[in-house]
C-alpha cells in the first residue's frame, strides 16, 4: 500500500508537470506580419507631445487597420521612457509579428507637423498619409479630438511636467482596460470607472483628459483580439518590476494598476486556496476531498514552476490555463465558495451557475463557518502563545459578535445566494450537529409557543374591541365618537384579514421549522 501511495503521488506530480522546453526539433516559426511603430526621433518634448496627439487621433478612427492600430498603441505605451526604441527591441519576443520602428521628428512642411526621419529623403507626404488616415476630411471628430471635454483641441505642450501628466492620464486609461478586456469585457465599464475615480482623487491623472467611451471601446476590443499587444503589455509590466531603485511616476502607476491585472481569470483557483485550504476547517479531512486536495497541490507546484508569467497565463492565452479551472476540483471549489459567501460580503455577487457546482458541498462550507464561529484553533493558539483563558474570552466575544451581526441582517448571510440554502431540516448534515443546534431548536419552539399565546390574546382583545362586519354598526354611536361609519367598517374588515393571515402563518409555523425556499438544483439547471 505504501508503494501504491508513492506511485500515486509521483503520477500526479508528473501529470501536471509542464512540458520540457528542450527537444530534438527546432523552434516552430509562424507566419509573421509587420507592425510599424512610430517613436520620437529626438528628445524634444514638443515632438513627443505632437506624436501623442496624432496617435490618439489615429486610434479613434474606426477605419484604421488592426496592425496599424497595434503599432500606434505600442508607440503610446512606450512614450514615457527615455529611449522607446531600445525598450521595444529589448522586451519584444513575439513569434507572430515583426516590429519595424520609424523615428518621427518635427516638420513645418507637412500637414501633421511631423515627418519620418530619413537621410536626404523627403518623407512629409508619407507621414501625412500615415497620421491623417489617408483622408483628412473623412472624420470631423478626429480633428476635434477624442476627449469628453470638447474644448481640448490638441494636447501639444512644451514643458516635461505637463506632458507627463497628460501622458500618464492617457496611459492609465489604456492600462486599466487590460484588467477585464479578456475575462469580462461586458462588465468592465463599472470597474474602469472606479479606477478612474481612484486615480483622480490621488491626483495621478487629470480629470479634464478623460477619453470618450467610443475611443476606449476601440482600444479594449483591440486588446482583446490581439495577443501580440497583450504580450507586449505583460512584458513591459515585468520589465518595470525588475527595475531596481526608484521608478518613474508613470511606471509606479502601471505597477499599481497591475494589482488589478495580475491573476485575471484565475479567481476560482485563488479563491479555492484562500477559502478552502487556508481557513483550515475540519471539513478538509473528508475522504471526498482527498483526490482534489492532491490535484490542488500539484497545481500549486505547477504555478510556481511557471515563474513570473504564471499570474498572466489567461491574458497570454497559455494552454495550460485549463488545468487551473474549477472543473478540475469541483467539490472543493463548491465547498470553498460556501465558506467565502459566509466570510466575505463581496463573495455574494459571484456567479455560481456552473454545471459542476454542487449545492450540497456549498452548504457544507456555509455550515462549517456558522457552526465554527467563535472557535479558536489550538495549533494557532499554541504558536501565538494564547492561553486557555484568553481563548475562552475570544470565543465568547466572537459568539456575541456573530449573533449581533446576524440579528442586524448585515454580513455574510446575503440575499443574493439565499436560494442555495437547503429546503430540508438541520438533520441533513448529521456530522455537523452539536449543542448549538439543540439550543437553536429549543429557542425556536419557545418562540413559537410565545407567538401563539401572544397572538391568541391579541386576537381576543381585537375581537372584543371591534365587532365583525356581519354585526350592524350603531351609526349614532359612531357619530358620537367622531368616526365615519364607513371608516370603522373598513378598519374592521382589515383587522379580520390580518387575523386570518396570522392564523395561516401560525399553521405553517407549526408544520415546519424552516421556511419554504426554492430548490437550488432547479434554479441552477
Swiss-Prot record:
Which residues are RNA-binding?
Answer: 180, 195, 202, 260, 351
One Pfam short name: Paramyxo_ncap
| Region named Disordered | 418-525
Q: Where is this motif: Nuclear localization signal?
A: 70-77
Q: Where is this region: Ntail?
A: 404-525
Spans annotated as Homomultimerization: 1-36, 373-391
- Region (Ncore) residue ranges read 1-403
Q: Major location, coarse class?
A: virion
Processing and modification events after translation: Phosphorylation at Thr-279 is required for the formation of the nucleocapsid.
Would you tell me the Gene Ontology cellular component terms? helical viral capsid; host cell cytoplasm; host cell nucleus; ribonucleoprotein complex; viral nucleocapsid
User: What keywords does the record list, in alphabetical order?
Assistant: Capsid protein, Helical capsid protein, Host cytoplasm, Host nucleus, Host-virus interaction, Phosphoprotein, Ribonucleoprotein, RNA-binding, Viral nucleoprotein, Virion
What's in the domain note?
Answer: Ncore is globular and carries regions required for N self-assembly and RNA-binding. Ntail is an intrinsically disordered monomeric domain in the C-terminus.
Similarity field: Belongs to the paramyxoviruses nucleocapsid family.
Write the protein's name: Nucleoprotein
Q: Which gene encodes it?
A: N
Amino acid at each position: 500500500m505504501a508503494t501504491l501511495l508513492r506511485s500515486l503521488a509521483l503520477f500526479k506530480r508528473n501529470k501536471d508537470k509542464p512540458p520540457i522546453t528542450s527537444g530534438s526539433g527546432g523552434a516552430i516559426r509562424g507566419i509573421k506580419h509587420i507592425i510599424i511603430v512610430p517613436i520620437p526621433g529626438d528628445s524634444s518634448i514638443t515632438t513627443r507631445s505632437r506624436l501623442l496627439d496624432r496617435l490618439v487621433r489615429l486610434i479613434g478612427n474606426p477605419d484604421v487597420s488592426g496592425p496599424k492600430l497595434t503599432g500606434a498603441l505600442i508607440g503610446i505605451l512606450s512614450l514615457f521612457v527615455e529611449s522607446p526604441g531600445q525598450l521595444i527591441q529589448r522586451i519584444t519576443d513575439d513569434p507572430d509579428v515583426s516590429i519595424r520602428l520609424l523615428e518621427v521628428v518635427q516638420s513645418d512642411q507637412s500637414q501633421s507637423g511631423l515627418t519620418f526621419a530619413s537621410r536626404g529623403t523627403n518623407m512629409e507626404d508619407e507621414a501625412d498619409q500615415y497620421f491623417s488616415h489617408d483622408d483628412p476630411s473623412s472624420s470631423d471628430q478626429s480633428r476635434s479630438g477624442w476627449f469628453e471635454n470638447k474644448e481640448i483641441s490638441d494636447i501639444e505642450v512644451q514643458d516635461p511636467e505637463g506632458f507627463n501628466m497628460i501622458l500618464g492620464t492617457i496611459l492609465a486609461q489604456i492600462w486599466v482596460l487590460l484588467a477585464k478586456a479578456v475575462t469580462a469585457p461586458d462588465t468592465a465599464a463599472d470597474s474602469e470607472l472606479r479606477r478612474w475615480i481612484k486615480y483622480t482623487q490621488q491626483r495621478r491623472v487629470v480629470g479634464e483628459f478623460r477619453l470618450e467611451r467610443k475611443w476606449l471601446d476601440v482600444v479594449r476590443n483591440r486588446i482583446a483580439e490581439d495577443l501580440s499587444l497583450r504580450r507586449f503589455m505583460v512584458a513591459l509590466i515585468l520589465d518595470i518590476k525588475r527595475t531596481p531603485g526608484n521608478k518613474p511616476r508613470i511606471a509606479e502607476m502601471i505597477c499599481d494598476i497591475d494589482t488589478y491585472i495580475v491573476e485575471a481569470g484565475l479567481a476560482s483557483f485563488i479563491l479555492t486556496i484562500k477559502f478552502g485550504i487556508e481557513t483550515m476547517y475540519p471539513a478538509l479531512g473528508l475522504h471526498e476531498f482527498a483526490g482534489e486536495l492532491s490535484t490542488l497541490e500539484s497545481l500549486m507546484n505547477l504555478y510556481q514552476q511557471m515563474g513570473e508569467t504564471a499570474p498572466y497565463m489567461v491574458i497570454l492565452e497559455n494552454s495550460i490555463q485549463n488545468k487551473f479551472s474549477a472543473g478540475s476540483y469541483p467539490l472543493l471549489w463548491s465547498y470553498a465558495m460556501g465558506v467565502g459567501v459566509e466570510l466575505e460580503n463581496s463573495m455574494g455577487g459571484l456567479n455560481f451557475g456552473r454545471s459542476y457546482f454542487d449545492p450540497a458541498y456549498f452548504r457544507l462550507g456555509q455550515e462549517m463557518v456558522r457552526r465554527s464561529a467563535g472557535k479558536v484553533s489550538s495549533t494557532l493558539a499554541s504558536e501565538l502563545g494564547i492561553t486557555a483563558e484568553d481563548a475562552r474570552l475570544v470565543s465568547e466575544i466572537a459568539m456575541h459578535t456573530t449573533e449581533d451581526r446576524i440579528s442586524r441582517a448585515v454580513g455574510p448571510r446575503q440575499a443574493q445566494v439565499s436560494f442555495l440554502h437547503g429546503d430540508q431540516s438541520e438533520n441533513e448534515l448529521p456530522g455537523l450537529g452539536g449543542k448549538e443546534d439543540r439550543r437553536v431548536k429549543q429557542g425556536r419552539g419557545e418562540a413559537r409557543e410565545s407567538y401563539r399565546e401572544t397572538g391568541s390574546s391579541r386576537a381576543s382583545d381585537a375581537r372584543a374591541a371591534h365587532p365583525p362586519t356581519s354585526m350592524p354598526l350603531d351609526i349614532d354611536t359612531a357619530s358620537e365618537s367622531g368616526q365615519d361609519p364607513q371608516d370603522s367598517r373598513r378598519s374592521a374588515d382589515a383587522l379580520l384579514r390580518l387575523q386570518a393571515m396570522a392564523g395561516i402563518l401560525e399553521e405553517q409555523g407549526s408544520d415546519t421549522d424552516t421556511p419554504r425556499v426554492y430548490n437550488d438544483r432547479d434554479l441552477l439547471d
